[in-house]
Every structure is written in structure tokens, then in C-alpha cells.
Amino acid sequence: MSVDNLLDLLNDQQLAAVLNIDKPVRIIAGAGSGKTRVITTKIAYLIEKQNIDPSRILAVTFTNKAAKEMKERVLQITNNSFKSPFISTFHSWCSKVLRIDGKHIGLEDKFLIIDSDDQKRIIKSALKESNIELSENDKKTFDKKILYKIKEWKEELVDPSEAILNATSTLEKNFAVIYRLYQNTLLKNNSLDFDDLQIYVYRLFKQNNEILNKWRNAYDYVLVDEFQDTNELQFSLIKFLTINTNHLTVVGDPDQTIYSWRGAKLDIILNFNKTYSNAISIVLNQNYRSTKQILDISNSFIKNNKFREHKEIFTNNKSGKKVVLKECNSKTSEASYVSSKIKELVKQGYHYKDIFILYRMNAWSQEFEKELANKKIPFQLIGGIKFRERKVIKDAMAFLKMISIKDNLSSQRVLGLIPKIGNITIEKIINTANLNHLNIFDLITNEDKTLLHSITKNLDELIEVFKTAHQLYLDNTNIEEILKYLLIQSGYENKLKIRKEQDDLENINALYDQLKRFDEDFDPKYYSEENKLIAFLQEEALTSDIDEAEQIDKVSLLTVHAAKGLENKVVFITGLNQGIFPSRISETSINELEEERRALYVALTRAKDELFLTYVKGDYSHIMQSELKPSKFIHELDKDLYEFETQFLNTLLYDSNDYKQSSFYVSPKQHNLYNVGDHVEHKLFGKGVVVKIINDQLQISFTNSSYGIMMIATNNSALSKV
């Protein structure tokens, strides 16, 4: 479709957003308002109608999925095979800048980007080196806390020496010492973490005017998608490139700012005009996704936030069904209700893949997983272990990194996979490498055999495998061929076969397929690197999206945050309980509470056709260490905009044959036969003692610690006195 045809399809606000190119433009894009169409049409318009060279346009977003989708749409519109990828994530663009100009701040171009597992290993090693003593309790959470603190320091541009100098407590000083050791390890291994990518570019631009001007002059137009998610550092990079020009468009929705815990600042999009005083603001307020009923309840709810920019979203979509709010008497009955309702929906013509089950925290999915499995409803858990984070894939990637980038972290991992080499030998290799100022790969493949003869005398064949693989890399051999050679000749693949690790072998085969596609599609003009393997490793390091829902017929279970940017025909938002959604942390902070409210708004606006909200009343929660109460957000929903279903027997759930057949079926006849202290037995949970009675609910402490304390209805047919 031509650009002219696309412009004809836009509404007035969308058209204004595309055609305004002489002033900075802030587009406030309501949920489902077609922002991706607007931003891609604007890029195509700049290329086709303003004759701007595609490589002189920079468009940045926050996920590889979004960048890929935008790139594909622009290519479809323009039929343009441009020279280099100009649509990318912030991190990918920063990586490109550093590959080209990082040498001006002492960075080698073939640096390694480490992942979260590497970070944890470095922290563990730094902790050992520091001799800092931790209690058993602190050890459990130390990794998470220190990495969060390091991220915070980096975003505030605080280096390790400043962190040590400004430490005000023993804990903070310990964190700062670990930070210094962590950063030293990165420098020694020519490695960067994700935060470093942006920090190094910031420092490069700050310190070197010539390089800054080079990159400023590289672009005639800059566009930023999901602008509400930007942090101060990212906004600084945008300002570096655009502060002296009018050629900037930012797109975002303040009502969907749900990543403040990652550093996103709501004020940046709200106060855009303070930085760009001549900017114009355009609101996209027509929703193309949801029914009027879903949109009305979403609009009504988000108005409870005080710190926001008012906008009234409307739709011309056909009217749909009323939103349903369902009260359940336990987490089990909530899961049973949802699964029974899913079966009804499928009978009505929906597919399983048309349905999302959303929750605020991952722990809430457990009951749904059990119940869906029991009812033989196919489902997938989104945001579980990603393909690239599976151990076998990380092992394979370590082989590739060792023979190309030669980083010590990957070399240590590979050596640890070889049966003939133990931890003591690896330590000797590391120490010898440090003494001789060599990396591990160069040491073990060194022609001077005296360096390591006593340590690696049984590894001559393996060392030859590494040397041959390194030469294959230098010859730019297909990556699939290099990896197959490494995994077969090293004995790694055979080890998986002997152990009958079928899943791992299937994952390796999937990786071979991925490498084959990359080899076939590789074109150096799309990369800042001519070597296939290096280009692949660079691209893979920057791929960090949450697992996407596979295009197969399964119900998807995912957190509200993972659902951002997605949509589906039917959405269940579950666990609307105080302390769960909103989370406990929001109880002492207005800003946190407003962010939780925005998170629910995001969840509400994922639904296209039907929306169900569920909560539990009276059940005991181990998460909360108390009875579950309805979320305060339920009281903020307009009662005229939803249909309420109680936990009692006149609900749809009671009429479900599936539910009547379950061991949790509650008979209509009431039984008030229990007293505190009674010994009882449940057909599924075993024996226990009644510790509290609330109306017709029993709080039972079960002997089996796996179940602990649970709320069970007095008339539950699976329960009896003993």
C-alpha cells in the first residue's frame, strides 16, 4: 500500500501527527489508538514524501519485538531496501555507537554484552574475593539487592569510587566494594552490562564534542516510541541528538507508565514542553481495539489518578457484552471459575489462543496451572525460562563466544563442562593466564606448551578442536557448521545423548535451525560487522524480550507487565485483592498506588471483546499471611459498568458440570457442625485442625506443611470430622 493510501486511512489526529515535521511533536497515544500505524506511516512519509535517506532516520523503542514490527511495516510500505537498520531498541543503537566509536573512551570494538546469569556469577566471585561475611538470610537475597543497587548507581552515573566515598552505612559500603570488584571484572574481560551500553554512550558524547556532532549530523529525524518508559539517562541521549533541532517525534501514553521500578520517569513525558518549548502536542483518543463497555470502565477507573494528563478515549466499535466482576470464596474456586468459563467460551466459538489470564504477580498462576491441566485445557506460561536462558543454550553460546570473542567468562563456563577438568584445574588456568597477561583461550591454545603442560597434558585433542573452530570463525564459516563441529568434537552433544537429555537435544537442534536461518539471511550491510559469528553474537546479546505467546491454540498465562503492548479477544484479570493488586508496597506511597492503578488500566485495555475480573474473599493467603480481602480498586470501578457475580450458589460456576464433579464441589445444604479445635480430614489435603471460623468458612491448619493454613467452606463435601 502506498503512503498516499495510508494517509487517507488516518483519522484527523493521526494525520496531524504524521504531517507535522517542522516542530518537536509529542503524541499522547491512548490504548489501542493505532500508534504503531502512526509512527510507521510517519517514517514512510519522511522517506517517500520528504526524500530523507532512510539511514538518516533514527527510530528507537524498548523491545526487539516492537522494533522488528515497525521495521517490517515500513519495508512493506516503502519497498525500500535500506542500508542499515535505523529502527532499533535504545540498547541496540547504543551498541552500534560503541562498536564504531567506543575506542575514543578506551573500549575495544569486540566487547561482550553480559546477561543476568553472568552478572550473578561475577557478583558471587566478587563476594568471595571481598571476604565480606553474610548471614544465611542475607545470602538468599544478596544477588538481587546488590544488582538493583548497582543499576541504581549506574543510572545516576555514580562510579564505584564515588559509591565507596559516599557510603553512609556498613551495608552500603559493602555494596560499593562489590560494585568496584564487579566493574573491574567487566573491564578486565572487555565486557559491558545492559546499563553500561547507555552510560558509555552518554560519557562518550559528554566528553567528546567531535563524536557528538558526528552522531548529531548522522540523523535528519529522530522518533521515540513508548516514550513514557524513558528514564533520565535515555532522555539525556535523546537531548544530545535533538536539542538543537525541531526534528523529533515522541509517542507514548502517561497512563501506561508502569516501569518506574526500572527507572522510567512519568515527569519526562508530562513535562516534555518544558524541554522543547516550541513542541506541539497531539492526542490520539480514538480506540480501535475494545468494545465501548470495556473502554468505558477503563476510562472511568483511570480517572482516580490525580497525576495524569486528562484525555477521554472513545470508540466507534460495536457495542459488546458487559464486563463481569466475579467474587470467589478461594483461590481454587477462582481458578475453577475461570477454567469453566473458558470451556464455555470455546463452545461459543472462541479459540484457546484468544484468551489471556492476567495476574499481578507470578506466584498467582499456580492454581490456574493446576486447574487448567485438570480440565485438559491447553495453556502456555508466558515469561518462564526463555529459550536463550536455558542452560544448554547458554552452554552452546559460551563455546561460540570462547573461540571468537575469547572472553574469560565464556571460557570458564566451557572448561567447567569438560569432565577431565575440575575446579582446581580451572583455578590454576585462571591464575596462570593472569600471571602471563593472557586471556584463557590464548593461554590454552598457546604454542608455548610449557605454560600449561602440567595442567592440560590430557587435553591436547580438545585444544586442537578449539584451535580448528577458531580458524573456522576467522574464515567466516557458517555459524551452524562451527557450532556443530564444537559440540560434536568436544563430546558435549554425545554427553547429552548418553544422559538421554531429549529436551536439551531438541533445544540444540532448534538453535541449529536458528543459526541456519541467520547464515542464509546474513547480509553485512545490515550490520556494523562483516563476520557472521560476531554479528550473530551482537544481535543475540541485545535480544531480551519477555517470551512472546506462541501462535498456537493455547490459553496464555502472564503477568500484567508482560501483557503490556499485547491484546486479545478475551481477558481474565485475576487476584484483584488488597496487597496483591495493588501490591503491599503501594500502601504507603501515593506514587506507587497510582502506578498500580496504571498497571490495572493497562490490563483492562488489553481486552478486545470480553473482560472478566475476579477476586477472592475470605480465603487465607500465605503471601499476605492473612485472609484475602477485595482490592480497593474494585470500589473504584463504576458499578453501572459491570455485572456482579457473587461466590454463592446462584452463579454460573454452580451450574457448571465440571465444577460439580470436582472434589471441591460445595453441596447446597448448609452444615454448621464445626467448632474451633475440631480435628478434620479433607479428601485431597489430608488431616488438620480447625483454628478459626468465619461465617461459614473454616480456617484449617493442615498437618501436611505443603498446604499449611487454608480456608474451606463448612459445607464442602470433601471435608469431614475425624
From Swiss-Prot:
ATP binds at residues 32-37, 289. Residues 292-565 form the UvrD-like helicase C-terminal domain. Its EC number is 5.6.2.4. It is an enzyme of class 5 (isomerase). GO terms for biological process: DNA replication; recombinational repair. Keywords: ATP-binding, DNA damage, DNA repair, DNA replication, DNA-binding, Helicase, Hydrolase, Isomerase, Nucleotide-binding. The keyword Manganese does not apply. It comes from Mycoplasma capricolum subsp. capricolum (strain California kid / ATCC 27343 / NCTC 10154). Belongs to the helicase family. UvrD subfamily. CDD domains: DEXQc_UvrD, SF1_C_UvrD. Has both ATPase and helicase activities. Unwinds DNA duplexes with 3' to 5' polarity with respect to the bound strand and initiates unwinding most effectively when a single-stranded region is present. Involved in the post-incision events of nucleotide excision repair and methyl-directed mismatch repair. This is Probable DNA helicase II homolog. Pfam families: UvrD-helicase (PF00580), UvrD_C (PF13361). GO terms for cellular component: cytosol; DNA helicase complex. One of its GO terms (molecular function) is ATP hydrolysis activity. It comes from the Bacteria.
